């Protein structure tokens, strides 16, 4: 606290303090600018400076409050100068506080962002999981069980059997099951008749891979839909069903005509059984009772009884075996037809050789015919000689004309060359009229050539 003896001295002191404060203002502003540019100043020092300045302001305010009664006689100019100095100080302090707060906030934000980025990258590297799949294990589990193969089970169990005549995909397994059930029924029904030929003689016209034992545990009365595969079956096209029925009827017709069409291929009662049966792919149908004479007839009856397509038509399924059998029958029929045509052609040729009429060469009619033929041949030969002679003479005359024309052309070319030489010499003549005529003549000759 300053002890002033008189109001005049107090006023002088206040003026000096105000002047000192005004002189100190530029360094304060420079300090604010330096704080903006320089970031090395710590926040603790800034807070201490702010506290000191606030204490100075409080002291000045207390002095002003204590000495207000004494300053009533001073001029209004001193009051205005003090107010201006206080406002300038407050404004400078406010700016310093804002700059310090902004700098500290920016530094803190940058530090926090760097820390978060580093920790996040570390956590990502540590917590990432590698995704691996055991593809071989999945494939093995998916295709290990043959019962779950569905439609592929037929292709796996039958090497090249039904691959050529497979219908749309949903029908193969069901058709195979129905054919297997029919095979079992035929084995039970015809096992005693054929003398042990149930397994080998049943479905003799069918491809043998149909007898696969992958589904023998199924009941005969089980429905078609109880198959292990869960594939939905599409309805059969009526046109396709009609085509199958026609093929089955053609097969039955071919089988019924065994005594006439396939008589040469069989040695049994009806020509359909034996060592070289063309309808079952060359497979034999052995029987245990070799001395029994009724074996061929029993196998033939069994064969013809199995040709009906009523079983599969009842289940609304395509008759795969019927289509294959009809195809084989058509092939055999075409081969037989070709062989028959070849034999007929050979027989016709032999018949023509042996069927010539016997002509008596001593008769007058034969002599007259031979004379007429000889005269005609002689005349035709004379005419041919005359034509050849005329052609030769014409060729000779043309060759002579050609030689004459060639000679004439050579003479004319020589004359032309001579005239050109003459005109070339006359072009340099002293008379301009002569030279002009020669040039024009040469030009016309060149254009004409």
Curated annotation (Swiss-Prot):
Protein name: CCAAT/enhancer-binding protein
Compositional bias segments (type: Basic and acidic residues): 357-368
Limits of the bZIP domain: 363-426
Domain of life: Eukaryota
Pfam families referenced in this protein's UniProt entry, alphabetically: bZIP_2 (PF07716)
Assigned keywords, A-Z: Activator, DNA-binding, Nucleus, Transcription, Transcription regulation, Ubl conjugation
InterPro entries the record matches: bZIP (IPR004827), bZIP_sf (IPR046347), C/EBP (IPR031106)
UniProt gene name: slbo
Composition bias, Low complexity: 215-229, 280-301, 339-349
Function, as annotated: Required for the expression of gene products mediating border cell migration. Among the DNA sequences that this protein binds with high affinity is a conserved site within the promoter of its gene.
PTM note: Ubiquitination/deubiquitination regulates border cell migration. Ubiquitination is stimulated by trbl, which leads to proteasomal degradation and inhibits border cell migration. Deubiquitination by Usp47, leads to its stabilization and promotes border cell migration.
């Amino acid at each position: 606290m300053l002890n002033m003896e008189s109001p005049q001295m107090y006023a002088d002191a206040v003026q000096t303090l105000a002047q000192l404060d005004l002189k100190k203002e530029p360094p304060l502003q420079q300090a604010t600018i330096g704080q903006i540019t320089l970031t090395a100043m710590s926040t603790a020092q800034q807070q201490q400076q702010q506290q000191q300045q606030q204490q100075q302001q409080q002291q000045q305010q207390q002095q002003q409050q204590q000495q207000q009664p004494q300053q009533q006689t001073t001029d209004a100019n001193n009051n205005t100068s003090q107010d201006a100095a206080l406002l300038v100080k407050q404004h400078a302090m406010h700016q310093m506080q804002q700059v310090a707060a902004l700098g500290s906030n920016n530094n803190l934000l940058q530090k926090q962002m760097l820390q978060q980025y580093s920790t996040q990258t570390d956590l990502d590297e540590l917590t990432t999981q590698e995704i691996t799949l055991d593809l071989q294990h999945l494939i093995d589990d998916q295709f290990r069980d043959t019962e779950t193969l569905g439609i592929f089970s037929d292709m796996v169990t039958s090497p090249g059997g039904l691959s050529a005549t497979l219908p749309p995909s949903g029908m193969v397994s069901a058709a195979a099951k129905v054919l297997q059930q029919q095979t079992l029924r035929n084995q039970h029904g015809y096992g005693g008749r054929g003398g042990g030929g149930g397994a080998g003689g049943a479905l003799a016209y069918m491809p043998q891979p149909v007898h696969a034992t992958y589904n023998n545990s199924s009941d005969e009365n089980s429905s078609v839909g109880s198959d292990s595969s869960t594939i939905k079956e599409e309805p059969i096209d009526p046109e396709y069903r009609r085509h199958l029925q026609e093929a089955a009827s053609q097969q039955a017709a071919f089988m019924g005509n065994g005594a006439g069409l396939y008589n040469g291929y069989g040695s049994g009662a009806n020509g359909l059984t034996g060592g070289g049966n063309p309808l079952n792919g060359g497979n034999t149908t052995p029987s245990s009772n070799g001395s029994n004479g009724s074996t061929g007839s029993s196998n033939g009856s069994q064969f013809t009884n199995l040709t009906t397509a009523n079983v599969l038509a009842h289940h609304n399924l395509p008759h795969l075996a019927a289509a294959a059998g009809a195809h084989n029958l058509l092939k055999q029929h075409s081969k037989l037809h070709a062989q028959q045509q070849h034999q007929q052609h050979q027989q016709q040729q032999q018949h023509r050789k042996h069927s010539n009429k016997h002509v008596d060469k001593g008769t007058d009619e034969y002599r007259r015919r031979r004379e007429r033929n000889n005269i005609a041949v002689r005349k035709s030969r004379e005419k041919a000689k005359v034509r050849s002679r005329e052609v030769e003479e014409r060729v000779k005359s043309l060759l002579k004309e050609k030689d004459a024309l060639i000679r004439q052309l050579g003479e004319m070319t020589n004359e032309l060359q001579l005239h050109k030489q003459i005109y070339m010499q006359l072009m340099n003549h002293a008379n301009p009229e002569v030279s002009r005529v020669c040039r024009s003549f040469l030009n016309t000759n060149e254009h004409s050539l």
